[in-house]
Amino acid sequence: VPAPGETGGSGGGESASVARHRAQAPQQVHCAVLTVSDTRNLQSDLGGDLLVQLLESAGHRVVFREIVADDADAIRAAALCALAGDCRALLLTGGTGIAPRDVTPEALRPLLERELPGFGELFRMLSYREIGAAALLSRALAGQRGGKLLFALPGSRGAIRTALEKLVLPELGHLAGESARRA
């Protein structure tokens, strides 16, 4: 039985506890953006541009941006560099498919202190609604390290928009606040 003012079950309602945590969450989160690609540069990185645009339009601040090669060691090194800075959330785009060069999940998993499996599950569910069975090819993931958030997203602009608009942006302040409390 839910407490007074809370909704029970999965009706999509927001509990009083979640509402309270959201109200206490930071309104602006400092973010880092890494694009994983062997072919992009800052002038041709449309996915990274979209990530920056969506984050900044939602009131967040991008404090670090870089392009890194599709190489697990390079991805790990760039992620650690970004996380050592003034960001609370690191968003990576690219390298989450099943091609041989797609190594972003393998690069990041050893860095995670805690994985957030619901992110990948929900992202694939939303993707299935938009693109059908091709959603199987996504290995998007999220997790925490040192009180900071990591999100590994596909390189497709449609997938970036879906992930940001439907999952990341609605909860980013809440997630950042909770992650910092537990650090």
Predicted feature residues:
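Non-catalytic beta/alpha edge segments that cap or flank active sites
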Residues: 1-183
